[in-house]
């Protein structure tokens, strides 16, 4: 019996690599990333690949991240965060391919303390990153065979994850970490997201017709500072955390209104752990 083909875009990142781990035994995976595949301006090479392999699903984990980088590289940000999913969605809808695209809490304005955003809340991004993701969201919800999955802050078991990599670096190099006290999210464990895609989305076609946008979230709002403190407590290592206001990191982009009070709320896909951090979070990385 032939395995169903899935094309994973961005297979080397934190979420992409987790999906590869979870799906490789049950599906035939074709994995590409910006490191090993040339994405031309019109994505013609990608289109040729899709025609050749004929996947049943395409999962897009590619995203240009980082406030400073996105603000200074708008063309590249729009290319990968907006034009790429737009192109893939156009082609997928015409060829009966189901397309899963990951979006972000950054599509919201994030200026009201305590506010957690639902699927039906109106997007109003303030950064180039948020704008690029929001443009994609607005376009994709009109396309058939397409599902937008919005995610809050992700944390995971590998050093490809931004939070974990900072902690690993701090332990190994005996360095201090500056952490924002006034930025909030509803952090979700990366393997939970991957597991949900595997066990629910890929086996239930109604997601692509009845639900155009879903949030995966804990519904549990927490500051980044207290979240990282919870991780530090679990790993029982001496790490120097310095609480700072987020403006400490934003000195070069003072004119950019960065959202502080984000986080996603959903009645549909709620992580049951309520941000209870898995003790295997950084297994093998910090000893």
Each model region followed by its residue ranges:
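NAD(P)H-binding glycine-rich loop region in Rossmannoid oxidoreductase-like domains
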Residues: 43-80
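N-terminal Rossmann NAD(P)H-binding glycine-rich loop of SDR-like oxidoreductase domains
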Residues: 4-24
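NAD(P)-cofactor binding segment of oxidoreductase domains
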Residues: 72-100
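Catalytic helix-loop patch of NAD(P)-dependent Rossmann-fold dehydrogenases
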Residues: 79, 83-84, 107-149, 153-155
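NAD(P)-dependent short-chain dehydrogenase/reductase
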Residues: 138-185, 190-199
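Mid/C-terminal beta-alpha module of Rossmann-like enzyme folds, strongest
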Residues: 196, 203-253
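Adenosine-cofactor binding site in Rossmann-like domains, unifying the SAM/SAH pocket
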Residues: 28-48
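C-terminal amphipathic/interface module of NAD(P)-dependent oxidoreductases
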Residues: 239, 257-287
């Amino acid at each position: 019996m032939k395995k169903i083909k899935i094309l994973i875009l961005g297979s080397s990142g934190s979420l992409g690599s987790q999906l590869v781990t979870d799906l490789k035994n049950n599906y035939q995976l074709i994995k590409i990333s910006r490191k090993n595949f040339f994405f031309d301006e019109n994505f013609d090479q990608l289109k040729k690949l899709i025609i050749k392999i004929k996947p049943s699903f395409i999962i897009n984990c590619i995203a240009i991240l980082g406030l400073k980088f996105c603000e200074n590289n708008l063309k590249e940000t729009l290319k990968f965060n907006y034009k790429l999913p737009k192109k893939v969605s156009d082609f997928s809808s015409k060829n009966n391919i189901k397309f899963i695209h990951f979006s972000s809490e950054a599509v919201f304005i994030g200026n009201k303390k305590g506010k957690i955003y639902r699927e039906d809340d109106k997007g109003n991004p303030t950064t180039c990153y948020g704008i690029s993701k929001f443009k994609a969201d607005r376009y994709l919800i009109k396309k058939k065979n397409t599902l937008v999955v919005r995610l809050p802050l992700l944390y995971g078991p590998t050093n490809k994850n931004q939070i974990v990599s900072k902690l690993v670096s701090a332990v190994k190099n005996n360095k201090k970490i500056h952490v924002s006290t006034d930025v909030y999210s509803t952090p979700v464990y990366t393997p939970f997201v991957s597991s949900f895609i595997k066990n629910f989305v890929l086996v239930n076609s109604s997601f692509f017709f009845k639900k155009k946008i879903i949030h995966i979230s804990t519904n549990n709002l927490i500051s980044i500072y207290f979240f990282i403190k919870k991780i530090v407590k679990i790993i029982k290592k001496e790490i120097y955390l310095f609480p700072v206001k987020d403006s400490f990191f934003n000195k070069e982009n003072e004119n950019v209104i960065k959202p502080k009070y984000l986080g996603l709320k959903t009645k549909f896909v709620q992580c049951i752990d309520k941000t209870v951090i898995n003790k295997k979070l950084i297994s093998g990385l910090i000893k």
